């Protein structure tokens, strides 16, 4: 039996994927697995029972990923599950920035008591006029699941699309339209594009990457969109760029006192993945990954440990080891098992940076004593008897 805990509301469609072997607990330190969306976990102390955390979404900056790794806690996310929902909002953001649709709606609402509203509308509509996005140049920084979908949709809307991503995956590249132009530098995006949208994770290297230096390289009257992470844009520099006319509009999904209600800025209340479909997709993907990990020891879409898939165990026993990626670990594991008279029938070992993960299928059941001896090896974070 396994227990799970939800730090945020999780779509029922996902929770219904859990079999009768799973029960929900209100105590996080009784849980084998934790499901989370936006709740901040950095100040939480997690007990030894917690084996995995699944973020129903892509970003994991609300989770202490490195600290979890050292506790042997695998952190999962759900890349691509909410991509279409975010993509649609980005496209909507470009349209809202191109024509004063919001201003027009507000103006009409203010005239609701006037009999001649139709005639007034004809006289006043020119103040809300704008431009079409067809034929304009769109620069996309980051061509992951969301960025690639934005790129393809924008081409269908008649935009000339430039993409920059030095780390693009082969799968993402294959999914891109052939009409998308490959930019070799951010400077090319800045200097060429009428619209720029950001789709990168928040890292030390990307924090405030859109700063004064970047704005200085952009075309006058550029439209900037940020539906990725709030700290990617230096908002003090942004305000100056808006006041100078360098930036025409800034559209963001991240509200704060500096940007809310300011002229030239459109702010939505973190609606990117707030669609029924996105929430369902994220929840289903998160639950499937947790179940496969807890029941089989397999890892898919982890942000700290490597992907590792040994399928379903057909032998007498299976154990998994979360450990440091350092020399001589495997030889120490096999010695402990050999000394206990345990024969290894299959082994899968994968590494990711400083971390590694090993799945061992064995011909005889594993005792708690053997697991204890494996855990005592320097560099081992967690040993789990899966079967």
What are these regions (language model features)?
Residues 147-148:
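N-terminal Rossmann-fold NAD(P) dinucleotide-binding loop
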Residues 1-78, 211, 223, 234-236, ...:
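An N-terminal-biased, well-structured beta-alpha scaffold segment characteristic
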Residues 42-45, 166-259, 274:
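Rossmann-like adenosine-cofactor binding region
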Residues 250, 263, 271-387:
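NAD(P)-dependent dehydrogenase/reductase Rossmann-like domain
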């Amino acid at each position: 039996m396994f227990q799970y805990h939800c730090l945020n509301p999780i779509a029922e469609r996902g929770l219904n994927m859990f079999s009768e072997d799973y029960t929900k607990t209100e105590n996080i330190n009784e849980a084998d697995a934790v499901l989370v969306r936006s709740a901040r976990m950095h100040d939480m102390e997690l007990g030894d029972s917690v084996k995995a955390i699944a973020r129903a979404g892509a970003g994991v900056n609300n989770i202490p990923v490195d600290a979890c790794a050292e506790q042997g806690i695998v952190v999962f996310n759900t890349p691509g599950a909410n991509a279409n929902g975010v993509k649609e909002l980005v496209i909507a953001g470009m349209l809202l920035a191109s024509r004063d649709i919001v201003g027009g709606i507000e103006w009409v609402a203010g005239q609701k008591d006037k009999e001649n509203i139709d005639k007034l509308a004809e006289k006043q509509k020119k103040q809300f006029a704008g431009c079409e996005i067809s034929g304009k140049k769109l620069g996309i920084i980051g061509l992951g699941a969301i960025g690639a979908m934005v790129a393809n949709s924008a081409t269908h809307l008649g935009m000339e699309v430039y993409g920059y991503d030095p780390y693009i995956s082969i799968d993402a590249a294959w999914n891109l339209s052939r009409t998308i132009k490959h930019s070799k530098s951010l400077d090319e995006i800045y200097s060429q594009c009428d619209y720029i949208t950001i789709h990168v994770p928040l890292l030390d290297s990307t924090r405030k990457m859109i700063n004064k230096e970047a704005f200085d390289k952009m075309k006058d009257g550029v439209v900037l969109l940020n539906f990725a992470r709030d700290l990617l844009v230096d908002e003090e520099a942004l305000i100056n760029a808006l006041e100078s006319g360098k930036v025409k509009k800034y559209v963001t999904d991240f509200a704060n006192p500096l940007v809310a209600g300011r002229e030239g800025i459109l702010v939505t209340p973190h609606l990117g993945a707030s669609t029924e479909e996105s929430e369902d997709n994220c929840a289903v993907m998160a639950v499937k990954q947790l179940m496969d990990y807890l029941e089989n020891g397999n890892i898919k879409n982890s942000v700290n440990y490597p992907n590792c898939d040994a399928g379903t165990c057909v032998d007498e026993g299976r154990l998994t080891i979360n450990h440091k990626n350092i020399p001589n670990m495997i030889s120490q594991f096999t010695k402990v098992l050999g000394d206990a008279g345990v024969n290894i029938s299959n082994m899968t070992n994968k590494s990711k940076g400083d971390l590694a993960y090993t799945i061992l299928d064995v011909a005889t059941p594993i005792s708690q004593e053997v697991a204890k001896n494996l855990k005592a090896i320097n560099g081992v974070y967690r040993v789990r008897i899966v079967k």
